[in-house]
Amino acid sequence: MARVKRGVTAHAKHKKTLKAAKGFYGRRKNTIRAAKAAVDRSKQYAYRDRKVNKRNFRALWIQRINAAVREFGLTYGRFIDGLNKAGIEVDRKVLSDMAIHEPAAFGALVEASKKALAYLKEAGTANEFESAVR
C-alpha cells in the first residue's frame, strides 16, 4: 500500500480553520488547536442563537404592538383576541411594522378589534358573532 502524504490537505484544512478564526483574540486566532476549539464553539453559539433570535424578535414585535395598542385604550391580549374573533389574520411582524409606519391602517385594525369585542359582548356567544359576520 502506498504512503499517503497529507501535507497539502492538512495545510488547506488548517488554513480554512484559521480563516474562520480571523478576528478572534489572542492565541485563538493563530494556533491551530486553540483556533479549532474556538471555531467549533462559535458554530455552536451561532446554531443556538439562530433559534434565540426568532424568540427575541417575536418578543420585540409584541412589545411594539402592545405600546401602540395602549394608545387606543386596549391591551395586547385583548387586541389579539379581538382580531381573532373578527377573523383578521395578520402576523405580529406585520402588525408591528404597521404600528410604526402606517398608524392610520393600524388604527383601523384596532377599531375592528374593538368592534368585534363589543359585538361579542352584546351577542353573548361566538357562534352568533360568526353568523353575523358572514
Swiss-Prot record:
The lineage of its organism: Bacteria, Pseudomonadati, Pseudomonadota, Alphaproteobacteria, Hyphomicrobiales. Binds directly to 23S ribosomal RNA and is necessary for the in vitro assembly process of the 50S ribosomal subunit. It is not involved in the protein synthesizing functions of that subunit. Belongs to the bacterial ribosomal protein bL20 family. The keyword Ribosomal protein applies. GO terms for biological process: ribosomal large subunit assembly; translation. GO terms for cellular component: ribonucleoprotein complex; ribosome. One of its GO terms (molecular function) is rRNA binding. Pfam families: Ribosomal_L20 (PF00453). This is Large ribosomal subunit protein bL20. PROSITE patterns: RIBOSOMAL_L20. It comes from the Bacteria. InterPro entries: Ribosomal_bL20, RIBOSOMAL_L20_CS, Ribosomal_protein_bL20_C. Keywords: Ribonucleoprotein, Ribosomal protein, RNA-binding, rRNA-binding.
